[in-house]
């Protein structure tokens, strides 16, 4: 409401699934086209597919026909927009309406004679500060990754097939959370910086990078461990030690107001002195309803950490001699005076 007052908005309408969930609570199917509308008095109208959800943080719940005889309609955007526009017919004083410029359907904008304002930047900023219910879901997703790494350490050995490992890890994550996942990623390749699983067997001497990002009720985890297929070499251990040294520094200096860009630059210089390997990517990013959110630990952005941020730190070193590299990724919550480590499980190569 404070943001609406600052932007002098009479109404906010969101169409992205993440933002509908952020405002109204339910997580709808990826193929659906719900809408949520918040007016200047704080009243929320939800337009849901087919039937009203069992629970929603909405003052009014309307529905549109997303399916006809179980067939998914292709014109859902128009159908949900028509329902909302009909509900708004009696509204007065609508002059400035906030919408997501990247995705708001023309069916909606062409039916309203108002000035439209892009609300997406403000929504992404609001999403940075995680509420307790959001943290609970992120912690649940992280618990799934803990179990996946425990299993990976049991089954990774010379000759194991990447597809078999992928299937077992996915099953372990589902059993851990007790329901279907709402997302599943990211990297499941052995002797590779990352990528989807292949019909390939792990070989002795290789390193297996697991960058895991299961989603629980819309909220993502995103952390990484590297596991040696057998005994790690001296070069692999030297690279691991250089990477592991990054985390105490992060935990010592990050607090509200700390520059994420400066942190990236410092770690980049740390890893330049590694005896083997090159650091080739970002240092990390925020996460929540989307795997990559602010803050960006990256030279391309200039942002500062804020209390309530949940973010990743993922230093890595890559070289053919390492077969093919090491990446370790922790997840943190920014508190009032520092950080809380959310991924307090082993990071060793074996």
Language model: regions and residue ranges:
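Active-site neighborhoods and metal-handling regions in enzymes and metal-associated proteins
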Residues: 1-350
